[in-house]
A protein has these predicted regions:
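Structural signature of tandem-repeat unit edges
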Residues: 1-4, 13-26, 36-48, 58-70, ...
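Consensus positions within tandem repeat domains that build extended binding/scaffold surfaces
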Residues: 6-9, 28-31, 50-53, 72-75, ...
Length: 172
């Protein structure tokens, strides 16, 4: 069966739904960017979602594979996602990965140590529980949301520029 889809293989089309085969282990960057996808069905064995793969679509909800370890830069930016739950296997989310969605809620993996720059910027988040293992939050990671309070984990050593700018934070 199909094991890999190349870079930009199906970009700039009018695809609405994609069912990825169980044999698939690699999806090239921007493979499905700039379509009209509302649904994606992931294979269980997929561990990495590369840069920009689903950028500029119409995704509203996602069920990520349970073994996913990495989400690349801009992988799901500019969609219509309203909530996200991340598998415990996930340790890294690339810059701008979920920027420009409609997220009101995210459930982060407890194993996540780094949140990249702009990851959740320009959404509608009202609250977020940061994992205890988190050590770094990138520039503007949560900028332009609707957060009213945030509890910083003890192990956090680095908060980037404007990480929480343009929110409604009243408590920290």
């Amino acid at each position: 069966g199909l094991t890999a889809i190349g870079e930009k293989a199906f970009s700039s089309n009018t695809l609405r739904e994609v069912v990825l085969p169980e044999s698939l282990t690699a999806i090239g960057s921007r493979a499905f960017a700039s379509n009209q996808l509302t649904q994606v069905h992931f294979p269980k064995g997929l561990t990495i979602i590369e840069e920009g793969v689903f950028n500029r679509n119409r995704l509203e909800n996602l069920q990520l594979p349970k073994n996913l370890t990495t989400i690349g830069d801009s992988a799901f930016s500019n969609n219509g996602l309203t909530h996200m739950e991340f598998p415990e296997s996930l340790t890294a989310i690339g810059g701008s990965a979920f920027q420009g969605n409609l997220l009101t809620e995210v459930k982060l993996s407890e194993n996540m140590t780094t949140i990249g720059s702009w990851v959740f910027a320009n959404n509608r988040l009202t609250e977020v529980k940061l994992p205890e293992r988190l050590t770094a939050i990138g520039d503007r990671a949560f900028a332009n949301n609707q957060l009213t309070q945030i509890k910083l984990p003890r192990g956090l050593t680095d908060i980037g520029e404007e990480a929480f700018s343009n929110n409604q934070l009243a408590r920290m």
